[in-house]
């Protein structure tokens, strides 16, 4: 059985999906590859994993949490699963290029395939695909949009030792611009 609910967040409305034991999806509404509720899904706001997710997201956006502790069950191919598992190893506030991510899982000649798997991550933000950047350091390819990717990286740099004091002002300014 698949359960779903919607919630409002600092970077827009989100859809959460879960089975009876674990989170299966976190999507920004309107993002690329966003899941759409199906007739056999059950809308349920108060299952334990959704309650835990909301609490952890609130702490994350306040800078009080850098690593999520939730049961995850993303659905994908074995290759996608391997890529998503590698994404979980990228520390909050840090970034990694697609090439280094491919190297880290033993697929150095398959950077595009790794990039495609990153783009299909069904649990955005929790499995931190926003921390993957282009070889030249540029922000590229985020299903939730580059503005959200930029905001998430600024938020993380503000609250970790990877950031600087200027990041707080940048993050607050970005939140104002994003809300318009």
Predicted regions and their residues:
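Basic nucleic-acid-binding alpha-helical/helix-turn surface characteristic of O6-alkylguanine DNA
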Residues: 1-108, 157-164, 170-180
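Short glycine/serine-rich loop segments
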Residues: 109-151
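Conserved segment of winged-helix/HTH DNA-binding domains
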Residues: 154
């Amino acid at each position: 059985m698949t359960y779903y609910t919607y919630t409002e967040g600092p970077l827009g409305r989100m859809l959460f999906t879960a089975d009876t034991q674990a989170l299966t999806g976190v999507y920004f509404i309107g993002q690329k590859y966003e899941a759409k509720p199906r007739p056999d899904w059950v809308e349920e706001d108060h299952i334990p994993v959704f309650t835990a997710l909301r609490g952890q997201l609130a702490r994350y956006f306040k800078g009080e949490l850098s690593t999520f502790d939730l049961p995850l069950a993303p659905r994908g191919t074995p290759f996608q699963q391997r890529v998503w598992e590698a994404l979980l190893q990228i520390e909050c506030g840090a970034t990694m290029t697609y090439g280094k991510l491919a190297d880290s899982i033993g697929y150095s000649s398959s950077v595009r395939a790794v990039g495609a798997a990153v783009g299909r991550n069904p649990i955005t933000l929790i499995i931190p695909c926003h921390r993957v950047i282009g070889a030249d350091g540029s922000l590229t390819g985020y299903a939730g949009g580059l503005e959200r990717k930029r905001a998430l990286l600024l938020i993380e740099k503000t609250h970790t030792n990877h950031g600087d004091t200027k990041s707080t002002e940048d993050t607050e300014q970005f939140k104002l611009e994003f809300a318009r």
